[in-house]
Every structure is written in structure tokens, then in C-alpha cells.
Curated annotation (Swiss-Prot):
This is Isoleucine N-monooxygenase 1. Residues 1-8 are cytoplasmic. The keyword Membrane applies. Its cofactor is heme. Unlike in cassava, neither cyanogenic glucosides nor nitrile glucosides seem to be transported over long distances within the plant. Glycans are attached at N38, N232, N404. Heme binds at C470. It catalyses: L-isoleucine + 2 reduced [NADPH--hemoprotein reductase] + 2 O2 = (1E,2S)-2-methylbutanal oxime + 2 oxidized [NADPH--hemoprotein reductase] + CO2 + 3 H2O + 2 H(+); L-isoleucine + reduced [NADPH--hemoprotein reductase] + O2 = N-hydroxy-L-isoleucine + oxidized [NADPH--hemoprotein reductase] + H2O + 2 H(+); N-hydroxy-L-isoleucine + reduced [NADPH--hemoprotein reductase] + O2 = N,N-dihydroxy-L-isoleucine + oxidized [NADPH--hemoprotein reductase] + H2O + H(+); L-valine + 2 reduced [NADPH--hemoprotein reductase] + 2 O2 = (E)-2-methylpropanal oxime + 2 oxidized [NADPH--hemoprotein reductase] + CO2 + 3 H2O + 2 H(+). The gene is CYP79D3. It is found in: Microsome membrane. It comes from Lotus japonicus (Lotus corniculatus var. japonicus). Involved in the biosynthesis of the cyanogenic glucosides linamarin and lotaustralin and of the nitirle glucosides rhodiocyanoside A and D. Can use L-isoleucine > L-valine as substrate, but not L-leucine, L-phenylalanine or L-tyrosine. Residues 30-535 are lumenal.
Amino acid sequence: MGLMPDFLSLCHEFPWTFLLVVIFSFMIFKVTKTHLVNKSKKYKLPPGPKPWPIVGNLPEMLANRPATIWIHKLMKEMNTEIACIRLANTIVIPVTCPTIACEFLKKHDASFASRPKIMSTDIASDGFITTVLVPYGEQWKKMKRVLVNNLLSPQKHQWLLGKRNEEADNLMFYIYNKCCKDVNDGPGLVNIRIAAQHYGGNVFRKLIFNSRYFGKVMEDGGPGFEEVEHINATFTILKYVYAFSISDFVPFLRRLDLDGHRSKIMKAMRIMRKYHDPIIDDRIKQWNDGLKTVEEDLLDVLIKLKDANNKPLLTLKELKAQIIELAIEMVDNPSNAFEWALAEMINQPELLKRATEELDNVVGKERLVQESDIPKLQFVKACAREALRLHPMEYFNVPHLCMNDTMVGDYLFPKGTQVLLSRVALGRNPKFWTDPLKFNPERHLKEGIDVVLTEPDLRFISFTTGRRSCPGVALGTTMTVMLFARMLHGFSWSPPPDVSSIDLVPSKDDLFLAKPLLLVAKPRLAAELYRTNEI
């Protein structure tokens, strides 16, 4: 693997970084030496690259950025579906096999239900006071109860139907205006990534703040400067949460921000707070002054929650932090899945034809597709499910932390072990999927069985499973399927005139398409169906 040359070249390129690492390593050497020796004797761990003394495999990780791609390449070279990578004093266990994944999240779920405390999640959760990013404990239990019982319950899901419909209608209005507007690149050219991401952002703002815009209302239904800045900040946080920062494994280096992750996340969080906090503060004042008496959105719901003593259940800090986390969780899967799926379907036009035929048969062309139509849209849902399988948003799920020494299969994992389930490799494992790299929605269709976007057997990860499963399955499923259904029912899609097919190549740093998908849209329905006056 050329370990020594990579290590030496990295030392030459970043000598001051490695000097600090070495200094810190020797500081902790006396404390950790005996512990590490005993640990290696006591625990039986999966195969992995031979670690360097003290720093483990940190040199390889730093020499092969991004680490997510390096880990997958390493496991392929080792021909293993579970590995052990030592990053300083942290044991990281990546998993690419659904059967092994179920051992962790189903059979031994109680032992692996926590989260590691690292720099990025500390910042994104404002000190671990939210839900998804928070270690197992009383704070997590409190905030999860709030989500499950008060924000994402079936009753609240139905209560918010009208707001979701408004944003689905606005999506149609926005794309229709793009079709009718003469632009430099010609009428109808749509950036699918922008449209899909801002649909998610609009749904978030409408459900939480009962408004589509932070700033000026845009006449075409599209995003303004404020909405663009907000959604970009959201995806920046997503990018750097669990991005294998060196300070996560050598905490002494956190404030030095050697890889720049800390400053990027903090800047994105400042942008989020810039838009959220004034609205939240003003809304609380309205309730306190008696100017508001009726709950209209989820912010109102959070403000009015009371504890057993009739005091506010959430502190202001908890409320604000949880709203930021909701923004992060609501925008990721739908937009990326749709962009990839539509690109795949353009290259396989028979799939696009079948999806639109199903929509026409179920809905017709005299009205817009609604959430009540979703149970009948089996092929459309199969397209969404296949996109989540083949084209996940991230390489790995949120890490699971081992809370006590646990035996899984033939291995004994020590407390503090981090387990990473590979969203990419689970969904593309050839032992579980025939022709796994082919986009084939048909594989999910079975007579008499409803197509769902969840996958409890972890053959791919959409909403995960176990104690740390996503409580927003209904909302996430609805947003994803409605994005697919409205865009496919309302418009016909084709490549620009100078493009014969879509290049299905991911970015070198993440799992987005390397180039945003640009397609020509043409309305399929009567003009009056695209009009909306809602803001």
C-alpha cells in the first residue's frame, strides 16, 4: 500500500501538524501504553491495517483524504466486510455487509445506541442538547420524546398537510415559470439540484416558521439570496458532520483547526442562527405579550410545550438548537435521491415513460398529484427507493458508539468503539443485490406488497433502524415521494440540445453528481394547474 512513502511525504508537506501530533502522542504515551497493550490482548477485533505506535492509522487517513473513500478502498483491498481501523486511541469499525450491520443495530442495538462526542457534532448540536447527534442519555430521551410525541406524530403530520401542499404547489409554480421564461440558455432549462434542495428548504421553513421566505418574496416562486445562503449553510454542516477531522481523534488539536472543519461549521451555524434567532425571539415575545394565541406551526408547538410544573419544557438554547438540527435532517435525502434518479431515468427513458404513465393512470391530467395518491404510486415509490439504495447522500451513517464491552459474532468490541455502517456498500453489496450498480426500480416491485422507503434489514440505509432510527420516517417519505411525483407528473424532462446522455459520475469529494443536473422542462398539464398565490 506504500504506507511509508505516503507517511514521509505527508510529514514533509505538513511538518508542523505532525510535530504537534507527535508531541501530544508522547504526552499521552505513559497513560495509554499499558491500556493499549492490555486492550490488544483482551479484545478480539476484525482485520485492519497495521497501526503505527500511538497515532494508529492517522497518517494513512491524513494522506488519503477524503477518509470515507480511503476506508472503502482499504476494505476492498483487504477483501473484508468488516474492518478495524485505529485512529489514535479510537477504534473505528466500518461495516459493508447487511447481515453484520443487523448484528449491531438489531441484535445488539442496546449496546451501540450512543454517539461519539466529537468537534463537529458538538458545534452542530450546540453542546449535545438536540436529538440525532447526541449521546445516549437523559437529554437524548427528552428530546426524542419531543420529536416523537409533539412534532412528528401522525396527528401533527396530518395537521401540517396543508403547508406541505403549499410547497408542493409552489414547486410546480417555480418550474413552470422557468419553462415560460426566456433565459440565456433557452426556456425551460432547470437546475434540478437547486430546485430539489430548495423544495426541501421551503418545506422546512413553512412547517417550522409558517413562511417560505426569510427575505423578499420572489415573484417566480424561487429562492432569494437569504434562502440560498440558508440552504448552502445547511449542506455545509451536513458535509462536515463526521468528516473525519484530525481533532476528533487528537482532541488537543481542536482549537488549532488544522483541517479547517471547525471554522467552516461555525460559519455555517452563524448563518443559520442569523435567520432563525430573530424569528424565534420575536415569536416567543408574541406569545408572552398575548399577541399570539393559536398554534400555527411547529415553532409555536415547541414554544408552548410545558413540563410537569407548567414551565417551558425546553430552554431557549434547546429550542434553537433543535430547530437547526431539524433543518439539517429535512433536506438531505429527498434532493440528492431525486437528482440522481432523474439522471438515471433520462438515460433509461423507458423508466421515465413508465413513471409518467403510472401517474397519468392514477391521477389523470386534470388535477395535481396529492399525498393521498401515494399508496397507489408503486413504481414512482420504487424509483425513489432505488435511488436511496444506489445513490445515498453520505458514505456512512451517523456513527454508533459502543457503550460497554460487547461480543458481536466472533469479535469482542471494547467500550468506546465507533461503528460505521457504509450506506454505499450496503446498498451495492452483490451478495444481496443482483447487478447492484444498475438503476433498476423493478427489483423493488413484488405482487401484493406495498413499496416503502424504509429497509429494516439494512440492505441499504434510508432512515436506519433500532433505538437511533429516524423518528421522521413519515415526513421524509412524504417529502421524497411528493418531490418525485410532482416533478414527473407536471413536466416532461429532456437533456439540453447539445447533450445526448447524462454522465453519471459522482463528485470526487462526495456523492453528489459531479455536475449539477441541468434539464429542459416542458409542462404536461393545463396552465391553470401551475398557478399559486401562496407565499
